[in-house]
Design a protein with these regions (language model features):
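Non-heme di-metal
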Residues: 1-214
């Protein structure tokens, strides 16, 4: 895929620079945190299932693990989500929030609980499909390293959860086979916007004023 080829080149540039690499990891951590936060904010306690609570805990654990890797690589200056220690953090969150808004609006005619459940399920399915692709390319660029090994565990969990959420969607939405293609197209367009922003940012990159651990 053209976008994969583009991302491979960007990842090569990122992992060659410890400061950029730490920001990259921190941005992944931030997105996992955004997912964790959104699950807790969107789900009413009365309908919060063990599966959804488990997913929230998984997102929080991934956010923490990636944060620790960012701090280990970049130093204490990366122990926050300040804009200067993220890599296109605003654009990455916009991808997530815009996708969430699209899915929510797509089910505006449903009951409140069904709308929340379907929007959550589709956003999760779309984001985890993308995450598996991006994390997979990233892991391939790392060789046999601590970060690659930790990503392997994360990928295994994401793969299992993607399978579970897809089975849930196929059972809950009779229109899944057609709706999923429409939603994939929207997600891909939003991802391309983020990828363009990342390409531009790396082309203009100058050293970040953060002490990087030696």
């Amino acid at each position: 895929m053209p976008s994969d080829n583009c991302l491979e080149g960007l990842i090569s540039q990122i992992v060659a620079d410890p400061a950029l690499h730490a920001r990259w990891l921190n941005t992944f951590s931030y997105l996992e945190y955004v997912g964790f936060r959104k699950i807790l904010k969107s789900q009413r306690a009365e309908v919060l299932t063990a599966a959804i609570l488990g997913h929230a805990c998984e997102e929080g654990r991934h956010a923490l693990g990636l944060k620790k890797l960012a701090v280990k690589l970049g130093g204490a200056g990366f122990d926050s989500y300040a804009p200067q220690v993220l890599l296109c953090g605003e654009e990455a969150e916009a991808y997530f929030q815009d996708l969430d808004q699209f899915c929510d609006e797509a089910f505006a005619d449903r009951s409140a609980d069904e709308r929340v459940r379907l929007a959550y399920s589709y956003v999760t399915w779309l984001v985890e499909r993308r995450a598996l692709d991006v994390y997979g390319l990233y892991k391939s660029a790392l060789g046999d390293s601590e970060i690659a090994r930790k990503l392997g565990g994360l990928l295994a969990e994401e793969t299992k959860h993607l399978s579970d959420i897809e089975a849930l969607l196929q059972a809950a939405d009779p229109a899944f086979s057609t709706r999923s293609k429409e939603f994939e197209s929207v997600e891909n367009s939003l991802y391309e916007v983020f990828l363009a922003a990342l390409t531009k940012a790396l082309a203009q990159e100058s050293p970040v004023k953060v002490a990087v651990a030696s």
